[in-house]
Curated annotation (Swiss-Prot):
Keywords from the named record: Cytoplasm, DNA replication, DNA-directed DNA polymerase, Exonuclease, Hydrolase, Nuclease, Nucleotidyltransferase, Transferase
Superkingdom of the organism of origin: Bacteria
Function recorded in the entry: Required for replicative DNA synthesis. This DNA polymerase also exhibits 3' to 5' exonuclease activity.
Gene Ontology biological process terms from the UniProt entry: DNA-templated DNA replication
Subcellular location: Cytoplasm
Any one GO CC term of the record: cytoplasm
Chain ranges of the Exonuclease domain: 425-581
Organism: Streptococcus mutans serotype c (strain ATCC 700610 / UA159)
Enzymatic reactions: DNA(n) + a 2'-deoxyribonucleoside 5'-triphosphate = DNA(n+1) + diphosphate
Name of the gene: polC
Pfam family, one: DNA_pol3_a_NI
Name by which UniProt lists this protein: DNA polymerase III PolC-type
GO molecular function: 3'-5' exonuclease activity; DNA binding; DNA-directed DNA polymerase activity
Protein family according to the UniProt entry: Belongs to the DNA polymerase type-C family. PolC subfamily.
Length: 1465
């Protein structure tokens, strides 16, 4: 027994007979770890053998009890020399294990503590009943049991569970027997009560039935109110009468076929999450449980059972009640509350959680007068923060946490005029116990003195730091306690090193670190700091070799083949650095003409050195409107000009735009904090002069620095904070306590953990500490939004007065410096095109006169006047003119342009050529230029002008043209005509890039930007992150907890992007920084376009956004026009043969059985999907108006299903009379007699799904007005079901395009099929497609069968759609040819009589570039062999073999073969 252990035995008063026993004869205390803050002493004991169980229990009891008297928690584990044991000892310790915290789970303890264990074949087996022998217990509890036994001294044991059938049967028998006894007992008690009651009733009285139901309910409710709350994490098996309290985060209500209701919901108590199920027998009972809603805090009680469908433990809820959740509150009185100056939102990429709305609302809830936004490197939360501040009545301070870098990082410091070839260099390296020159120690200084490339002298000394080295230091440097033991005093080593370095140039790799450490130690020992020249080989390498990705000592020595045997030992590092130095000097002389030390910083350091410069954080705040614009410029420059891995702001650029901005020192990654940590207060004062205020953060936020051994302990953190405050005092700069907020509540920490860890070890924050399999990243800091009270508690070590100054007084005084700024403008700023108003008006009337004559019909004249008054009066003319110019340019290139949205509601847009849709009431118009007579049908009896019967002009006898879709202008620009027009245009996908460039050409490159988007973590992605975290960090979550964690982790910014067609146009009398910063999409510096930094929706009411979209329809129309020579504008919209497609297949010459569908809708845009084909089958439309209805019904939400479909089936309404498109509501109600304003308002309420959200009073007013005008009840009820409606103008444009395509399908089928396969088909299988009808039908049947069992791939689903068209084409008598090596085109199908020849891209796996290369190569000469085809055509061996198998290559040989006789022929 060691003296130390003997002393401990005396102190805890161990019984004498035990203390003197042989058991403790070789006992020793191996290690004691003391944790003063948490008051824990952790002992590690050593014994010869495993302790008898009574010895262990006595030791544990006395040790714990003795230390408890001093308010210290004592814990221990044991190591033994001989770990032999009997099964009896094993069983005794097994039962002891369940008294330990590691094995104290309620379910594990209750199920396993009474079982028997045995040791067999190197494994401990637990004999258990069948129902607990499962993977859950194996995965979650046996590892804890194994760890506990290791702590007992048993070493590493492996545990497993084996089923004991006898035990299983006995438990079942016991359960049944016990249950039967309970039933019999209950029956007997009931019988005795009944007899007792009968005996007590007088004979003449009729006994009344006894009912104690209400009492039982009351008793149960009382029990529910008083029930003990069980943490969800403790439930691991089926249990009865469990009570939870928690937050509802997901709710789904279902109704069974029998009318019963199921409420499936999920709750969390933040220990875990649980699925719940509550049944309600009818609607009345269901209403009782309205409190079960997302965000509600509930107490629930029920039985935990395995759900047979989800296979998950689920609570069948019996009781439920709402509870009051105790939220954190800021308890300080108003006027004495803090202001958070450092807070991140979910726009901090993959780093923070709250939306800016949540952040601002939380600050307002706390009663804080203001809150700052400081996202990492971006300001994308500004617009929403601006609106949130106004909504919550709180001042929002707009800022960001910038990545500050030096523009030109020097290679040499303290440079002097010196011939580098003649200089003597001391190349040195230091090894330390950490990165802080203030908190860590030097343990080795080594140097090589070199002249003309030769080592002339060396220096190498270890230094004893006066304390044991940590394992981390030893692992990193290879230096052990033995190396430093007995070393010279540090003062002597420093003096000797200074002498060694006299009259030399110092050299180090990452010299700022080494020199900083040396200067701090020189100063500490009253020695002069370094003043001689210092060359940093790290910056030397970065500037000489900017193309290298890594410039660390290790990668450089490998690249230049310099020996480095023991990296991170100073002597080896110094010698390797010296060898590299002379390689660099030679390179600098030969390539840059560098001979003098002064030349290093002037001839080699270039303007791109910022890309490799070390990033330091700084917080930048907007003080006024000028500051806002300057910040927008800085953000733009950092993302566009100075982006390198992250958005960087060079210091000189910040200086250039600093007016109106306020600078803070940021977090532990700021340069002031770093200087205090690494060099001390004196140096930090110089650095801090650049800033306006000093930030200090709660000690908890600096705790990761402890894990990284940058700071020794909690006292060290407190000292750093005091030093930062001292820096502020010396410079008379305010010190503000900030919270570096990344989430709102402490329990949200896990969400950030999941998001951050998903970045992998490549992210700096996830770099493992130490080496080996067990190396883990530093813990993330506690970064929730702290109240004033919590913040004062964090800084209590400073004293009350100072704590209040930095937490309350200074931040509130700082807020007074901030002026109100306008982040989002209130007005629309359209670009300027000279004479745009006159041009729009002129073009409108010119076209109107051309069509309708001069003077115009009153209905036309009034409509134009009404629209132009709105368009010109609100400054919208330039939007119309720009759209017209874009459409006209595309038309000139031979493409039609389709309109989207409601622009077709504007007759002016029709007249100037933006849209083909005519919104006037249905009408006839005479095309005779000498007549131009017109007739309008204004009573609503005709839905579309295309449906008017053919008619001869009553004035001149010319056949009338027909037009007009009856769409009110109000649906485009609002009832008052002042809504910003959103003109969406569908350009051909082939022409879209040209149309985009047209925008630049019209407005100027500096005024046209792609509309920016922000991509956030999607729900499915978040789910993947949670599962990855679970896997990587050894967690196990039940499914409900995974769902909760995924829900909490979703929505965080992940990347940026661009709208597929949206282009934002800045007015040419302003600049983009008046509205938004700019950037490249997804930080792609090679992108052709810059985008708005803000999501374009945030500024869409301030600047013009043109939607220049790409679409297949215009491309298809152009292809058909090229093939046929037919002008698509001449195709009639009422062709009777085309309309037959919607009612049968006869017009195609095929039967329903042959093509598998009752109509001819396959491949027709808008009508070819399964959903719309089903609608067509049910309704059989015969008019253009009915097709518009179908288009509206198919695009709306809750317009067809459960609404119009039922009305048509029940015969209540027809396809023509149901509500189809949004505009029809307004038109119908006006025809019914409602005032236009009310008709418009009702339409707006219905189309946005707000009918049931408005007040009952408002809704009843509309209903009364409709009923007064005889609007049927079914129509009113239909309005109430709608969630979203399609614009009629959009439907009209789409249907018109669809009918043009359908025209070719009916009248020019081979052209149609050629265009369809060239443009619309997404998947091909040429072997099947060219093999004939039987092969095609067989493949379709195969895919259909797979789809029924959800086994068809996405490619097969797309292929099925293609094969439907192939099948139809073949049934109509056309042929699908084989791919032809010498005739097939690269990308387009070719017509050969009645046969289509496929292009090379139709071959699976062959891309467009290879297809074009094949065509190019064959034009240069015939392919003589497969080898030649591979080489010249750029084909893979796999593709060549596939072509060979399909017979495409004929008898082509493998290789070119030459014969002796070749030359004779």
């Amino acid at each position: 027994m060691s003296e130390l252990f003997k002393k401990l035995m005396d102190q805890i008063e161990m019984p004498l007979e035990m203390k003197n026993s042989r058991v403790f004869s070789s006992a020793d205390i191996v290690e004691v770890k003391v944790y003063p803050e948490s008051r824990i002493w952790d002992f590690r004991f050593s014994f010869e053998t495993i302790l008898p169980i009574d010895f262990y229990q006595e030791l544990r009891s006395r040790l714990v009890t003795s230390f408890e008297t001093a308010d210290i928690k004592a814990v221990f584990d044991i190591e033994v020399e001989n770990a032999e044991f009997s099964n009896e000892l094993l069983q005794a310790y097994y039962q002891e294990a369940f008294k330990q915290p590691t094995c104290n789970s309620a379910s594990f303890k209750s199920s396993f503590s009474h079982l028997t264990v045995s040791y067999t074949d190197g494994k401990v087996l637990i004999s258990a009943p069948q129902f607990v022998n499962n993977d859950h217990f194996r995965k979650n509890h046996l590892p804890n049991l194994e760890k506990q036994f290791e702590a007992f001294g048993f070493g590493k044991l492996s545990f497993d569970i084996v089923s004991n059938q006898k035990m299983t049967e006995e438990i079942k028998h016991h359960f049944e027997s016990s249950r039967q006894q309970q039933i019999q007992k209950a029956s007997q008690e009931t019988l005795e009560i009944q007899k007792s009651l009968e005996a007590s009733i007088p004979p003449e009285e009729i006994p009344k039935p006894v009912s104690n139901f209400k009492e039982r309910i009351k008793d149960r409710q009382a029990a529910f109110e008083k029930a003990e709350i069980t943490p969800m994490a403790e439930i691991e098996t089926e249990e009865n009468r469990i009570t939870f309290e928690g937050l509802v985060f997901d709710v789904e209500r279902k109704t069974t076929r029998t009318g019963r209701h199921i409420i499936n919901f999920k709750m969390t108590d933040y220990t875990s999450s649980f699925p719940m199920q509550k049944w309600a027998k009818d609607d009345e009972e269901l209403k009782k449980y309205d409190m079960i809603s997302k965000g509600a805090w509930l107490r629930v009680r029920g039985n935990i059972e395995n759900n047979p469908f989800t296979k998950a433990l689920t609570m069948n809820v019996q009781n439920v009640k709402t509870i009051v959740h105790k939220e954190r509150k800021d308890l300080m009185p108003q006027g004495e509350k803090r202001v958070e100056f450092h807070a991140h939102t979910n726009m901090s990429t993959m780093d923070a959680l709250p939306t800016v709305e949540q952040l601002v609302a939380k600050a307002a809830q706390f009663g804080h007068p203001a809150v700052a936004i400081t996202d990492h490197g971006n300001v994308q939360s500004f617009p929403h923060g601006y609106h949130a501040g106004k909504k919550n009545g709180i001042k929002v301070l707009f800022g960001l946490e910038a990545n500050l870098v030096e523009d030109r990082v020097p290679i040499v410091y303290n440079e002097v005029d010196m011939d580098m070839n003649e200089a003597t260099y001391v190349v040195f390296d230091v090894e330390t116990t950490g990165l802080s020159a203030i908190n860590n120690d030097l343990i080795q200084i080594a140097a090589s003195k070199m002249h003309k490339g030769n080592i002339v002298e060396q220096f190498d000394e270890f230094i004893d730091p006066g304390h044991p080295l940590s394992q981390f230091t030893t692992d990193l440097t290879g230096i052990t306690d033995q190396h430093v033991k007995g070393a010279k005093p540090i003062s002597q080593v420093l003096q000797e090193f200074q002498s060694f370095c006299q009259d030399t140039v110092l050299v180090a790799h990452n010299a700022t670190f080494d020199v900083g450490f040396m200067n701090a130690n020189y100063e500490r020992h009253d020695l002069p700091k370094i003043t001689q020249p210092v060359i940093d080989t790290l910056e030397f390498a970065r500037n000489l070799y900017p193309e290298y990705k890594r410039h660390g000592l290790g990668p450089l020595t490998k690249r230049f083949q310099v020996s480095l045997e023991h990296h991170h030992m100073a002597n080896y590092d110094a010698e390797a650095t010296g060898r590299l130095l002379f390689i660099f000097l030679k390179e600098a002389k030969e390539k840059h003409g560098v001979n003098n030390l002064l030349d290093l910083n002037t001839k080699i350091v270039d303007d791109n050195s910022y890309k490799k410069a070390r990033v330091k954080h700084a917080t930048i705040y907007v003080l006024n409107q000028k500051g806002l614009k300057n910040l927008f410029k800085l953000v733009s420059l950092s993302n566009v000009t100075y982006f390198a891995g992250v958005a960087r702001i060079p210091r000189t650029i910040l200086d250039q735009y600093r007016d109106g901005l306020l600078l803070g020192t940021a977090c532990s990654d700021g340069e002031v904090f770093d200087t205090v940590l690494s060099k001390g207060v004196e140096d930090a004062v110089e650095v801090a002069k650049y800033y306006d205020f000093i930030e200090v953060m709660p000690p908890a936020l600096y705790e990761p620095l402890l894990a990284r051994e940058l700071i020794k302990d909690e006292a060290g953190i407190q000292q750093i904070i005091k030093d930062l405050i001292e820096v502020g005092r010396r410079l008379d700069k305010p010190v503000l306590a900030t919270g570096d907020v990344h989430y709102l509540e402490p329990e949200d920490e896990i969400y950030r953990e999941i998001i951050v860890r998903s970045l992998g070890q490549g992210a700096m924050i996830n770099r493992p500490i130490g080496r080996g399999e067990n190396a883990q990243p530093a813990p993330l800091p506690k970064a929730h939004f702290r109240t004033t009270n919590e913040m004062l508690d964090e800084f209590a070590f400073l004293g009350e007065d100072l704590a209040r100054d930095i937490v309350i007084k200074n931040p509130n005084e700082m807020v007074e410096r901030f002026e109100d700024v306008e982040v989002v403008k209130t007005d629309l700023y359209t670009p300027f095109i000279e004479n745009s108003e006159e041009k729009v008006a002129e073009m409108t009337y010119e076209k109107a006169f051309e069509i309708y004559g001069n003077p115009l019909p009153d209905i036309i004249d009034l409509r134009i006047e009404k629209e132009l008054t709105s368009i010109l009066g609100n400054g919208f003319a330039v939007i119309y003119l720009a759209s017209q110019m874009l459409v006209n340019r595309s038309n000139e290139r031979g493409y039609l342009v389709g309109s989207r949205g409601s622009v077709g509601s504007s007759f002016v847009a029709t007249m100037i050529g933006i849209t083909e849709v005519n919104p006037m009431p249905p009408h006839y118009i005479c095309p005779n230029p000498d007549c131009k007579h017109s007739e309008f049908i204004t009573d609503g009896s005709v839905g579309s002008g295309y449906d008017l019967p053919d008619k001869i002009c009553s004035e001149c006898g010319t056949p009338y043209k027909k037009d007009g879709q009856d769409i009110p202008f109000e649906t485009f620009l609002g009832f008052d005509g002042d809504k910003v027009p959103d003109i969406d245009l569908n350009f051909s996908g082939d022409d879209q890039p040209s149309a985009h460039l047209d925008v630049r050409d019209i407005f100027g490159e500096e005024y046209a930007f792609r509309a920016g988007t922000v991509g956030t973590v999607a729900d499915r992605t978040a789910y993947g992150f949670v599962k990855g975290y679970e896997r990587d960090y050894g967690k196990f979550y039940r499914d409900a907890e995974v769902d909760r964690l995924a829900q909490g982790s979703a929505g965080v910014k992940r990347t940026t992007g661009q709208h597929p067609g949206g282009i934002v146009v800045i007015p040419n009398y302003m600049d983009v920084y008046d509205f938004t910063p700019v950037q490249y999409p997804a930080d792609d510096l090679t992108a052709e376009w810059q985008t708005t930094h803000f999501n374009f929706h945030d500024i869409d009411e301030n600047v013009l956004k043109l939607d220049v979209l790409g679409h297949d329809d215009p491309t298809m129309i152009r292809k058909l026009q090229d093939l046929s020579g037919i002008d698509p504008k001449t195709i009639p919209a009422d062709d009777p043969e085309v309309m037959k497609l919607f009612s049968g297949t006869e017009v195609l010459g095929v039967t329903e059985e042959e093509i598998g569908t009752p109509t001819g809708m396959l491949g027709i845009p808008e009508f070819g999907t399964n959903f719309v084909r089903g609608m067509v089958d049910e309704t059989h439309p015969t008019t253009f108006a009915e097709l518009l209805q179908l288009s509206g019904l198919s695009h709306g939400t809750d317009v067809w299903l459960g609404n119009a479909q039922d009305l048509i089936k029940q015969g209540i309404a027809t396809l023509s009379t149901v509500i189809g498109c949004r505009d029809d509501i307004m038109v119908y109600l006006m025809h019914a007699g409602l005032e236009p304003k009310m008709a418009f308002t009702i339409m707006e309420r219905v189309r946005k799904g707000a009918w049931l959200k408005i007040s009952e009073e408002e809704r009843n007013g509309y209903i009364s007005a409709m009923r007064e005008n005889n609007v049927p009840d079914w129509y009113i009820e239909s309005c109430g079901k709608i969630k979203y409606m399609f614009p009629k103008a959009h439907a009209a444009a789409y249907v018109l395009m669809a009918l043009r395509v359908a025209y070719f399908k009916v009248h020019h089928p081979i052209y149609y099929y050629c265009a369809y396969f060239s443009i619309r088909a997404k998947a091909f299988e040429l072997k099947t497609m060219s093999a004939g009808l039987d092969a095609v039908k067989a493949r379709m049947a195969d895919i259909s069968q797979k789809r029924k069992i959800n086994q068809a791939s996405n490619v097969e689903i797309d292929l099925f759609t293609t094969l439907e068209i192939v099948n139809e084409m073949l049934e109509r008598g056309f042929k699908f040819g084989q791919l032809d090596l010498y005739r097939s085109d690269a990308t387009e199908f070719i017509i050969d009589g009645d046969t289509l020849i496929p292009p090379f891209v139709a071959l699976e796996g062959l891309g467009e570039n290879v297809a074009k290369q094949i065509v190019k190569a064959r034009n240069e000469g015939e392919f003589l062999s497969k080898t030649e085809l591979r080489k010249r055509g750029g084909l893979s061996s796999t593709l060549v073999e596939k072509m060979s198998d399909m017979g495409i290559l004929g008898s082509m040989p493998e290789d070119n073969q030459l014969s002796l006789f070749d030359d004779f022929f």
